[in-house]
Curated annotation (Swiss-Prot):
Key component of the proton channel; it plays a direct role in the translocation of protons across the membrane. This is ATP synthase subunit a. InterPro entries: ATP_syn_F0_a_bact/chloroplast, ATP_synth_F0_asu, ATP_synth_F0_asu_AS, F0_ATP_A_sf. GO terms for cellular component: plasma membrane; proton-transporting ATP synthase complex. It is found in: Cell inner membrane. The lineage of its organism: Bacteria, Pseudomonadati, Campylobacterota, Epsilonproteobacteria, Nautiliales. It comes from Nitratiruptor sp. (strain SB155-2). F-type ATPases have 2 components, CF(1) - the catalytic core - and CF(0) - the membrane proton channel. CF(1) has five subunits: alpha(3), beta(3), gamma(1), delta(1), epsilon(1). CF(0) has three main subunits: a(1), b(2) and c(9-12). The alpha and beta chains form an alternating ring which encloses part of the gamma chain. CF(1) is attached to CF(0) by a central stalk formed by the gamma and epsilon chains, while a peripheral stalk is formed by the delta and b chains. It is a multi-pass membrane protein. It comes from the Bacteria. Belongs to the ATPase A chain family. PANTHER family: ATP SYNTHASE SUBUNIT A, CHLOROPLASTIC.
């Protein structure tokens, strides 16, 4: 937002520069945490390794009920990396002097496209092109001309759903606290910061669980048809 101080804004106030800088910072933090967690692996984990193992076990447990144990572990690298990246991007809205890249539609749209392309790729790879797209037509052949375009629109709408949900919530929280700071810059904004912290966790979780849900719908066609 224009007029708000950011550390990167000292270098340049160009909006694109600020967005890209904060995005790379979120990516760098993700890499640093991953590096610290795997630097000295121990049988009995301590420190950052302990936190990371707990996080990864939580991600697998989250995916287990959606897609099964084996697939939850298979897609763990994608979902866990997205989770860390999005979380650090969201967290920047809480820290003064930083601007959350997830409050930019370009960021969230890019992530949504990654998920969309990947789950369709996995669905085609697992089931074959014909079988995968035949599933869009539904079980009743007579209704296939109606169901196929509806399913196509439904899948494309997932891009909008994923991207605008994350963007809207983070941007909305940002604007909400900004208004509170303008009205009363001391005690009043504190509940707003608590809300932003909760939202950072919640929106990360929602994006991760939906990624697992979309992957399950793409690769488990055989189970759905039973």
């Amino acid at each position: 937002m224009e007029g708000i101080f950011t550390f990167f804004g000292v270098i340049s106030e160009n909006h694109t520069f600020l967005f890209v800088s904060h995005m790379f910072l979120a990516a760098l933090l993700t890499l640093i945490v991953a590096k610290l967690a795997t630097k000295r692996l121990q049988v009995v984990p301590t420190g950052c390794q302990n936190v990371m193992e707990a996080y990864l076990e939580g991600v697998v447990a989250m995916g287990r009920d959606v897609i099964g144990e084996s697939y939850a572990k298979k897609y763990l690298p994608l979902v866990a990396t997205l989770g860390l990246f999005i979380f650090f991007a969201n967290l920047m809205e809480i820290i003064p002097g930083f601007e959350p890249p997830s409050g930019n539609i370009n960021f969230t749209l890019a992530l949504a496209l990654i998920v969309f392309i990947y789950y369709n790729f996995e669905g085609i790879r697992k089931n074959g092109v014909i079988h995968y797209f035949a599933h869009f037509a539904g079980p009743v052949k007579l209704l296939a001309p109606l169901m196929f375009p509806i399913e196509i629109v439904s899948h494309i709408s997932r891009i909008i759903s994923l991207s605008f949900r994350l963007f809207g919530n983070i941007k909305g929280d940002d604007l909400f606290v900004w208004v509170l700071l303008m009205l009363a810059p001391w005690i009043v904004p504190l509940p707003g910061f608590a809300l932003m912290t909760f939202s950072a966790f919640l929106q990360t979780f929602i994006f991760m669980i939906l990624t697992y849900v979309y992957l399950a719908g793409a690769v488990l066609l055989h189970e759905e048809s039973l």
